[in-house]
Amino acid sequence: RDFWFDAEKIAQAERIAFNRWGYDRIVLGPNTRGIVEALGGTFIYPEDGIPYIESPYITDYGILDRMEPVNVKKNHRIQVFAQAADILSKEAENLVPLEASIGGPFTIASNLRGVEYLLRDCRKKPEEVHRLLEIITQTQMSCIEMAAEYGMGIAMADPVANPALIGPKMYEEFVFPYTKQLTDYTVKKTGKKVSLHMCGNTYSIWKYLVQYELNELSLDNIIDLQRAVEEIGNQIPIAGNVDPVQVVMNGTKEEIDRAVAACIQTGEKA
């Protein structure tokens, strides 16, 4: 639990992990949880377990009348991650890139409102959903400004915004404009493009994803990597695609090596 609230321990955990595995970037928060909390939501943090949302914060859209975008420089919750970034930016300079994860606007909205209610509201109360997404996006832009101060890039993930839950038309209306605004703003403020991970079967929204300012699009392992290479590989860098459970978590070293090599062999054609 301390990992989420103590800047020194966040930095220590990331330092230990990097020294052990030597991966190609260090990703810090605030992520979806930190931004949800900054906007008023509440998570439960088990002593040893994955945090989970206590209950939706927005039970009535009247709350938006008093909700404002967060200035992260004045927000204690976000400043924990800023302090960790300050520590690691000095240690990691010229060694490994740092990124700040800022979640995705639609997923943050789902945490504040509740997934079921948010999806219903997209049909019945679209104006209110847009009001909420504007506040979230402005808050994420403040996080981007913070990241820029430490020379960090930006990572995003928007799992609720996948076609298993919303169709392409809904994605175009409620996700694309805000994500496009964020990726454009990231380049403007940091000089770096965004790392984006999208869960699920995303074929139907590829035409939107390729319009973002991305240094990589990380695809779910259920995606046909060969098809991705052929259809969008010349428009955007592709990453991911190794099964995180069956291979990375439960597989042997040899199985992991084979899976990674297969992805590289397919992806190098892009």
Where are these regions (language model features)?
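Glycine-rich, N-terminal phosphate-binding loop and its surrounding beta-alpha-beta segment
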Residues: 14-43
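Active-site loop segments of alpha/beta catalytic cores
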Residues: 1, 17, 24, 28, ...
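Surface-exposed strand-loop-strand hairpins of Gram-negative outer-membrane beta-barrel proteins
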Residues: 2-9
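Intrinsic-disorder/low-complexity, polar/charged segments
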Residues: 6, 57-63, 75, 252
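A contiguous, low-structure linker/loop signature
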Residues: 34-71, 94-95
